[in-house]
């Protein structure tokens, strides 16, 4: 039985409503959103978000000032697990990859379908980065504060708001802090969750909160394939061994050929030769050089075609260099090593999940914008699990820069946070 078969009842529930389309974005004509938004319980939950906002800001600062470099998230993960435990979640744990999680039980049977609400623990910054939070008016500034530390604190605020309002959901909600979302982390945390984790067959819907903008809904997973490709040869003195094959020439030819590939405007597909190195001195034919290549596409098929073209180019460039110069001391060889593999995928804009999220955005007086990006949602999307990524509320900027910032003006932040909470409640169901 497939994952989709096991989740069929929950998925059917997400798709039961009827909808209209306007301006390219699906608008809900019948969803749980209006009823939940108009309820006294949701009003109480949203009021608690406002009343409790200073604590949310304090949590943002606390977590931001715990460094979480790539592959070194353990200290922040430990602190976040303690926070999940303090919020009364059950089955709190750290898995083998370093993800932390805790369960908020719903009214449904134990072991039934559940909704995952996640944010990522890691940042792009190295361990020696100063992550002290500075405040100027309503702006907080520090590396990683918006991507994605604010979202971690927002998840805690959601739990407190639901508890304060006495909200009981139909499905369980699993709150998840993932590792390895950024860069060469290659989605290792969420990948482990969906391939090895104990909840992998129970997920009916997946929310990733990443960034600030509550109106941007990621429904398309931009896949990527990344190679660090080594070109090797015999090397030698640049003057005395002139005429021998040169791996630099083969690598340069390969890179130039890559940039001759013409790509269609749709599905959006890109390539880049990004990092290069090798050699020992200016007066030596290098024995080894390398370049890192990045390929991306919204389409799994287009990405696979581009990858096949690049791998063929590597072989062609090596053969051309071996034919052009002497191989008396040995030929040029090539070794492409995969350093990144993020699957492409999508969640249907007409799915119940997306429609509920769009309805929640519109209920707050915003307009929704559907987009494609590379986020933790790539993994569930590629597996056919309904998934979206959205912002956790408010505004921010300069992500991945040392002067990264968020604005913590309360009114607009609570408005944006209410979008996420309303969407979660609509998808998990309210008893």
What are the residue ranges of the model-derived segments?
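Acidic/histidine-rich catalytic neighborhood of metal-dependent amide-processing enzymes
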Residues: 139, 144-222, 264
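Glycine/charged-rich beta-loop-alpha catalytic/anionic-binding loops adjacent to active sites
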Residues: 131-142, 232-236, 399-405
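A non-catalytic alpha/beta surface segment that caps or lines the substrate-entry region
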Residues: 59-113
